[in-house]
Regions:
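Beta-strand-rich domains and repeat architectures in extracellular enzymes and scaffolds
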Residues: 2-27, 52-56, 305-307
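Surface loop/turn motifs at the tips and blade-to-blade linkers of beta-strand repeat domains
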Residues: 3-4, 42-48, 88-91, 153-156, ...
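Canonical WD40 repeat/beta-propeller blade segments in eukaryotic WD-repeat proteins
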Residues: 6-12, 48-58, 93-100, 155-166, ...
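Short coil/turn segments that connect the beta-strands within blades of beta-propeller domains
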Residues: 16-17, 62-64, 103-105, 169-171, ...
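Structural core positions within WD40/WD-like beta-propeller blades
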Residues: 20, 67-68, 108, 174, ...
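Conserved strand-to-loop turn within each blade of WD40 beta-propeller repeats
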Residues: 23, 69-72, 110-113, 121, ...
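Per-blade loop-tip surfaces of WD-repeat and WD-like beta-propellers in eukaryotic adaptors/scaffolds
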Residues: 30-39, 77-87, 113-151, 169, ...
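Terminal intrinsically disordered, low-complexity extensions flanking WD-repeat/beta-propeller proteins
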Residues: 135-139, 143, 235-488
Length: 488
């Protein structure tokens, strides 16, 4: 019988009154001062044989609402104070990135299809009505075609969107994808592209606009450097080398994802080179890959610092933000935490809580199968003497996160949590370079299944964007066009 182990905390959000943590399909709220666990909620998948594990989450700035999504393609909104599920909406494709607008009233979702949709926090009543069971074939086709009557299409990429950020005035949205692109578009008129930040050689997986420098963008992904941009002009200001700092701390190696070869007789038709939840994939682990997962500018007293980590890496990295914007002298530092970092959250008192994975030796691609000697799932860090160091004292909240919030499962099933999925999903192979669905894919007349359906759906997205653009241009021709107000 397989032994059970305590699963790690995938996401942590620390608010002034309540802290939220996500583990598998369970959500916990804790009192941020006492650490007492106040509420527990469990997500159940609406479909058979579909995982109920929560993959992504986001909270509003006021810490009133939590938004989550997972493999079941449901967008759930929760009330933080009692973890009541306020709404549950079906979305066309699995969500990849979730963000909330500054006022907390709009949810922005980037999906595996390469599009960003916006949804109102409180859905219209019609959205909550049960779906009719009649004509289920048409419904399935509509979902596959990426029809989304409940969401507003903002923009679309020809590749999976890996991250996006709204600028500090929410006048623009900056989006990145698996095909090395960083695009600056007007928001919410996302079809109106203002600028490109070009230069990455590999996928881009993390973006950050520092609050201390709102006209600058920092991006990272699979390249051995972080890129610093003047995003309004697309100018690359600097590149900060990071790979030599990260490589010694890699605990989980990545791999490449390829379409699974069909069993039995070989098909005469070439299998579609489309990476999605509609194609069976196999993974090959054992290669070192860099995937920058999160970038965040933090202020410690009077010092601005950029924190970041990489998937499968056991250290938290940081550098001081240069006031002079001279990045030539930037020194990248690291703090070894022994176990791979999963997430970090900034606490109001200037401390940082870091979630780590003590179960990593059980995951595919682990560099060692020897169990970790440190079972702590959360560490608290502080800024001291010009460095990020571990806090010598352990708060009641950290104690509760480490000892409570107990979610156990078989040791051989930690891979189902998807903690290291980007290490396998983002790198490309020569045979799979078009893995996200190229725009020039021919569209056959029969679009009821297979690659034709995917290509037709992408073409439909493009047509929808063009239609919106044409309507807007027509409207501006009938009225005096007002100049756009640039952000300062």
């Amino acid at each position: 019988m397989t032994a059970e182990i305590q699963y790690p905390l995938f996401r942590v959000f620390v608010g002034p009154d309540r802290t939220i943590t996500i583990c598998g399909s369970q959500i916990f709220t804790l009192n941020s001062q006492s650490g007492a666990v106040e509420t527990l909620a469990t997500v159940s998948s609406a479909e058979k044989n579909v995982s109920s594990v929560i993959r992504i989450g986001a909270v509003d700035e006021a810490y009133q609402h939590l938004v989550t999504s997972g493999d079941d393609k449901r967008l759930r909104v929760w009330s933080i104070h009692d973890l009541k599920e306020l709404s549950c909406r079906e979305i066309p494709k699995r969500a990849n990135v979730l963000k909330l607008s500054q006022d907390g009233q709009t949810i922005l979702v980037a999906d595996k299809f390469g599009d960003i949709f916006s949804y109102p926090l409180v859905p219209p009543e019609s959205t909550l009505q049960p779906q009719s069971t009649e004509n289920t074939g048409s419904k399935s086709l509509a979902v596959a075609m990426h029809d989304n009557p409940h969401g507003t299409l903002i923009l679309g990429h020809a590749s999976i969107i890996t991250d996006f950020v709204l600028t500090h005035g929410e006048k623009q949205v900056i989006s990145a994808d698996r095909d090395e692109h960083v695009r600056v578009s007007w928001y919410p008129e996302g079809w109106d592209v203002d600028q490109y930040c070009l230069g990455h050689k590999m996928f881009v997986s993390a973006l950050e606009i520092p609050a201390c420098a709102p006209s600058i963008l920092v991006s990272g992904g699979g390249d051995p450097e972080l890129y610093v941009w003047e995003y309004k002009t697309g100018k690359n200001m600097a590149r900060i080398p990071i790979w030599n700092h990260i490589q010694p701390f890699l605990k989980v190696k990545g791999g490449r994802r390829k379409p699974e070869k069909p069993q039995g007789k070989k098909s005469k038709k070439k299998k579609a080179v489309v990476e999605s939840e509609d194609v069976d994939m196999v993974t090959e682990s054992g290669e070192e890959f860099l995937v920058v997962s999160k970038l965040k500018q933090v202020r410690f007293g009077q010092v601005d610092v950029v924190l970041f980590f990489a998937v499968g890496c056991s250290a938290l990295f940081y550098f001081r933000w240069p006031v002079s914007l001279d990045f030539g002298g930037v020194e990248v530092c690291s703090l070894d935490l022994a176990n791979p970092v999963l997430d970090f959250a900034v606490v109001q008192d200037g401390k940082v809580l870091v979630s780590v994975d003590p179960t990593w030796p059980t995951t595919p691609g682990a560099v060692s199968t020897t169990p970790s000697t440190d079972s702590r799932r959360v560490r608290r860090l502080v800024w001291k003497d010009g460095q990020v160091v571990e806090d010598e004292s352990e708060s009641p909240l950290v104690q509760s996160l480490n000892q409570g919030c107990d979610v156990k499962g078989p040791a051989n099933e930690t891979h189902t949590l998807g903690l290291y999925e980007p290490l396998f999903a983002l790198p490309k192979t020569a045979e799979f370079e078009s893995g996200d669905g190229a725009e020039d894919t021919p569209v056959p007349q029969d679009i009821t299944s297979g690659p034709g359906l995917r290509a037709s759906a992408r073409q439909k997205t493009k047509e929808e964007l063009e239609k919106r653009k044409a309507l807007t241009q027509e409207a501006t021709q009938r009225a005096t066009k007002q100049p756009r107000v640039e952000e300062t």
